[in-house]
From Swiss-Prot:
This is Trans-aconitate 2-methyltransferase. Its EC number is 2.1.1.144. It catalyses: trans-aconitate + S-adenosyl-L-methionine = (E)-3-(methoxycarbonyl)pent-2-enedioate + S-adenosyl-L-homocysteine. It comes from Rhodopseudomonas palustris (strain HaA2). Catalyzes the S-adenosylmethionine monomethyl esterification of trans-aconitate. Gene3D superfamilies: S-adenosyl-L-methionine-dependent methyltransferases, Vaccinia Virus protein VP39. It comes from the Bacteria. The gene is tam. HAMAP family: Tran_acon_Me_trans. Pfam families: Methyltransf_25. Its main location: cytoplasm. NCBIfam families: PRK01683.1 (NF002463).
Length: 256
C-alpha cells in the first residue's frame, strides 16, 4: 500500500481527534515523565498529549513518512520516529502508551498489546482506541465492489486485509492477568456529513486506501463511482439533506 496521506486524513480532523480526546480523559496518570503516541499520524493526538502533560517527554511513533512530516511541522519541538509499532519497544521508564486508531492495522495485535503492557512499570498505562467498523456498510461495500469484475483480481487481497476485531471478552482475558485495572468500552459515533460523497472522502483517508491504491486512475475512478453509488443507497439523507455515518470504536485502558 502507498504511504498514508496526511492531507486526506486531516479533512475530518475534528471528528478523528474526538475519540483521542475521550480516550485521554480516562487516563488517570497525573504527571508522567515519558509518554509515547503510537501511530501518531499527523500529530493531532500528540498535540493533545503535550497539552495534557506539558512537562512530559512525549514522542510520536508512526510508519508513514508523510504523516511524520506533517507531525514535525505541527509540533517542531517534539520528537517523532519512524517505526512499526509491531516491532517497537518503549524507552525504559515510559509511563503512558497512547495508541489511537493504529492497532486495527496490526496483525495479531493482541500479542503486541500484551507485550507492551508487560513492559510497563507498575502504574503505567496502555490506552488504546480502534475503529470497530469492518462490518459497517461503509466497509462491507468496499469489499463487495472489490469482489466484482473488473477489480476482483487486483483487489482480492485488499478485501481480506483487515479482520474483525476480537470480542471485548478476548481483550479482557488476554490483558486482565497483566494489569491491576482494565476498562473496556464501545462508543458509537454518528458523524454528521454533507452527503455520500463526504463519506467516501472520509474513508479515502484510511479504510479505502488498500482498495484504491493498487488501481490506475481510470480503474480508480470506476471503482469509486461504483462504491459511491452503494454508499448513497446505504446512507440516505436526513431531513436537512445531511447523512449520518455510524462509526463504532472500542476503547481499552489498561493500568499495570
Amino acid at each position: 500500500m502507498a504511504d498514508w496521506s496526511a492531507e486526506q486524513y486531516l479533512k475530518f480532523e475534528d471528528e478523528r481527534t474526538r475519540p483521542a480526546r475521550e480516550l485521554l480523559a480516562q487516563i488517570p496518570v497525573v504527571a508522567p515523565g515519558k509518554v509515547a503516541d503510537l501511530g501518531c499520524g499527523p500529530g493531532n493526538s500528540t498535540e493533545l498529549l503535550v497539552e495534557r502533560w506539558p512537562d512530559a517527554s512525549v514522542i510520536g511513533v508512526d510508519t508513514s513518512a508523510d504523516m511524520l512530516r506533517q507531525a514535525r511541522e505541527r509540533l517542531p519541538q517534539q520528537k517523532f520516529i519512524e517505526a512499526n509499532v509491531a516491532h517497537w519497544a518503549p524507552p525504559p521508564g515510559t509511563e503512558v502508551l497512547f495508541a489511537n486508531a493504529v492497532f486495527q492495522w496490526v496483525p495479531d495485535h493482541l500479542k503486541h498489546l500484551k507485550r507492551l503492557i508487560t513492559g510497563l512499570d507498575e502504574g503505567g498505562v496502555l490506552a488504546v482506541q480502534m475503529p470497530d467498523n469492518v462490518d459497517e456498510p461503509s466497509h462491507v461495500m468496499m469489499r463487495e465492489v472489490a469482489f466484482q469484475e473488473p477489480w476482483r483480481h487486483q483487489l482480492s487481497q485488499a478485501a481480506e486485509l483487515r479482520d474483525l476485531l476480537p470480542k471485548p471478552g478476548a481483550y479482557y482475558d488476554a490483558l486482565r492477568p497483566l494489569c491491576s485495572r482494565l476498562d473496556i468500552w464501545h462508543t458509537v459515533y454518528n458523524h454528521v456529513l454533507d452527503d455520500a460523497a463526504a463519506i467516501v472522502e472520509w474513508v479515502k483517508g484510511t479504510g479505502l486506501r488498500p482498495f484504491i491504491d493498487p488501481l490506475d486512475l481510470h480503474e480508480r475512478k470506476a471503482y469509486l463511482a461504483a462504491y459511491t453509488a452503494r454508499v448513497a443507497a446505504a446512507y440516505p439523507p436526513q431531513s436537512d439533506g445531511k447523512v449520518l455515518l455510524r462509526f463504532p470504536r472500542i476503547f481499552i485502558v489498561a493500568i499495570k
